[in-house]
A protein has these predicted regions:
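Amphipathic, non-transmembrane alpha-helical scaffold segments
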Residues: 20-24, 28, 66, 110, ...
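C-terminal regulatory/oligomerization modules of transcriptional regulators
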Residues: 1-9, 115, 130-153
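Generic leucine side-chain signal with a strong bias for well-ordered alpha-helical environments
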Residues: 35, 51, 62, 80, ...
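Charged, amphipathic alpha-helical coiled-coil/dimerization segments
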Residues: 78-137
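N-terminal helix-turn-helix DNA-binding core of bacterial DNA-binding proteins
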Residues: 25, 29-72
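N-terminal leader segment of winged-helix/HTH proteins
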Residues: 1-38, 99-102
Length: 153
């Protein structure tokens, strides 16, 4: 049976969740460094990427994607609107709600940051011991497992 203690010394991983946390922190630090000077941090870049792909999305959909509380997303959206990178548009079916979309300035900021993101991505992918598609599938499986565990908790 594998030792599941939280090791501080040695090369052996401690637990899947702890290693996931460490990996997330390392990825955020790498992206924050790569994106320095663009005005976007790793979280901004991820949100802009989702908005660019979705076109328009409700704050609730963004909250589910981010696995974040609605209040966190609301604060984030307000900051991006104030920056002029995101605009709120009325929801076509629900007048009480709105959708968010990138402005032209937001798309430009995302494109500029993307030019710095791609070399960081290429460096990480080149260092992987297996194909990036396999690693990405494992990460998607892990996220699904964490989501399922959160539902049961």
């Amino acid at each position: 049976m594998r030792d599941r203690s939280n090791r501080v010394k040695g090369d052996e991983p401690s637990t899947v969740l702890f290693d996931t946390w460490l990996t997330a922190r390392a990825a955020i630090a790498l992206l924050d460094s790569a994106l320095a000077g663009t005005g976007l941090d790793a979280e901004d870049f991820a949100v802009y990427s989702v908005l660019r792909q979705a076109g328009e999305i409700s704050p609730g959909e963004l909250a589910r994607w981010m696995s974040a509380p609605a209040t966190t997303v609301s604060s984030h959206v307000k900051r991006l609107v104030a920056r002029g990178h995101v605009r709120q548009v009325p929801h076509p079916e629900d007048r009480r709600s709105y959708r968010i979309t990138l402005t032209d300035a937001g798309q430009h900021a995302h494109t500029t940051a993307g030019r710095l993101f791609l070399p960081a991505l290429a460096t990480v992918e080149a260092a992987l011991p297996r194909p990036s598609s396999d690693v990405q599938q494992a990460l998607q499986d892990l996220r699904a497992a964490i989501g399922a565990a959160a539902q049961r908790a």
